[in-house]
């Protein structure tokens, strides 16, 4: 039975329509970020037209390819997304979200990532499934993201990992900036784990100085290690802090020891043995279960009985469902539940010795080596 043609759209229909029509508007987010429209609008500090925003933009950046018509449509759509306020007669005004985006540059780069690489992958999901007779789950470097490049005729990028593609397309520095602050965090890493009930202070203070070594695997620009050093300056020096990041655009990170380790290579074992802490923050959700087990097993093989592996990821629930989708489409990864973490640990020769799963934000999972 179909709904009457003249009946008003029910609330459920409005919800469906407003959600599924977001994608085209989200496609304009990279335009807003590229031309710094949020910063220009905030600088004006009062209701403004697209022409006003373009004038500020030219004052800041000189002559660019930003036209008034492109700025007007982009500002309008950003207003529709709630990123700024829409006023009558194509007039726009900064709001709290605008100010947040300007004050949190990493959030703008994150918005660009999910509406560039993420939106591209989502557009090719159904095509990838149909063309492979709905083969699922995806495997690393064989996701809708790579399939998009294959169908666009770029066979070289179609075989590359997302990070490699971003490097080749000049997008990796932007992504690295996103990872430094993401969409905002509560406090530092020590603050966050304390709030979840983890006794980091007791662990640090009860460990002999010669055994204090922290290894951050996939640690980006070293933010976590630097936060640890700031929390325990009397205990942690450069030689205690090891950053392992396989990323061509990271550069030199002061105050930590940088060490190359490409864990993707089958013959490449974890070079640091017996560290007190091995950390993986937002690393495993980029990996499939098989690849996650491989990485966990490599760490397990070098762990001492006193070693801990600390994992920080989003708690898998309704609040993280959208990032779960992004990990699937771009990386063949996923967010994980308590049961899924236990399964991964068991397959890798580890056991969970602490876990906390807040309803919002990052979960914390501590794993230790299973002793025979």
UniProtKB/Swiss-Prot annotation:
S-adenosyl-L-methionine binds at residue 186. InterPro entries: COMT-like, O_MeTrfase_dom, SAM-dependent_MTases_sf. Its EC number is 2.1.1.-. The active site is at residue 285. The keyword Ribosomal protein does not apply. Pfam families: Methyltransf_2. GO terms for molecular function: O-methyltransferase activity. It comes from the Eukaryota. PROSITE patterns: SAM_OMT_II. Pathway: Secondary metabolite biosynthesis. GO terms for biological process: methylation; secondary metabolite biosynthetic process. Keywords: Methyltransferase, S-adenosyl-L-methionine, Transferase. Cytochrome P450 monooxygenase; part of the gene cluster that mediates the biosynthesis of bifonsecin B, a dimeric gamma-naphthopyrone. The first step in the biosynthesis of bifonsecin B is the production of gamma-naphthopyrone precursor YWA1 by the non-reducing polyketide synthase albA, via condensation of one acetyl-CoA starter unit with 6 malonyl-CoA units. Belongs to the class I-like SAM-binding methyltransferase superfamily. Cation-independent O-methyltransferase family. This is O-methyltransferase bfoE.
């Amino acid at each position: 039975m179909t709904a009457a043609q003249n009946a008003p759209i029910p609330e459920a229909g409005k919800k469906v329509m407003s959600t599924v029509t977001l994608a085209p508007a989200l496609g304009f987010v990279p335009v807003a970020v590229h031309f710094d429209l949020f910063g220009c609008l905030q600088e004006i500090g009062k209701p403004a037209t697209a022409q006003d925003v373009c004038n500020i933009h030219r004052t800041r950046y000189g002559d660019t390819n930003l036209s008034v018509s492109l700025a007007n449509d982009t500002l309008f759509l950003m207003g529709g997304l709630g990123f700024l306020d829409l006023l009558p007669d194509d007039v726009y005004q900064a709001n709290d979200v605008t100010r947040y985006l300007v004050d949190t540059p990493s959030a703008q780069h994150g918005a660009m990532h999910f509406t560039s690489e993420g939106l591209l992958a989502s557009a090719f999901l159904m095509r990838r499934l149909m063309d492979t007779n709905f083969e699922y789950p995806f495997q690393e470097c064989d996701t809708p993201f790579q399939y998009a490049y294959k169908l666009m005729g770029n066979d070289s990028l179609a075989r590359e990992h997302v990070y490699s593609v971003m490097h080749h397309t000049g997008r990796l520095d932007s992504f690295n900036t996103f990872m430094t602050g993401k969409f905002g965090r509560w406090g530092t890493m020590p603050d966050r784990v304390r709030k979840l009930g983890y006794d980091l202070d007791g662990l640090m203070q009860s460990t002999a100085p010669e055994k204090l070594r922290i290894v951050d695997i996939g640690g980006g620009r070293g933010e976590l290690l630097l936060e640890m050093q700031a929390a325990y300056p009397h205990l942690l020096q450069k030689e205690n802090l090891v950053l392992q990041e396989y990323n061509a655009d990271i550069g030199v990170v002061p105050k930590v020891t940088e060490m190359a380790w490409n864990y993707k290579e089958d013959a490449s074992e974890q070079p640091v043995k017996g560290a007190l802490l091995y950390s993986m923050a937002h690393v495993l959700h980029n990996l499939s279960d098989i690849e996650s087990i491989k990485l966990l097993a490599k760490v397990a093989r070098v762990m001492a009985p006193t070693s801990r592996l600390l994992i920080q990821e989003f708690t898998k629930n309704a609040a993280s469902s959208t990032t779960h989708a992004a990990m699937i489409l771009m990386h063949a990864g996923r967010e994980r539940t308590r049961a899924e973490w236990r399964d991964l640990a068991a397959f890798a020769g580890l056991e969970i010795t602490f876990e906390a799963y807040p309803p919002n934000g990052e979960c914390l999972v501590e794993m230790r080596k299973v002793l025979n």
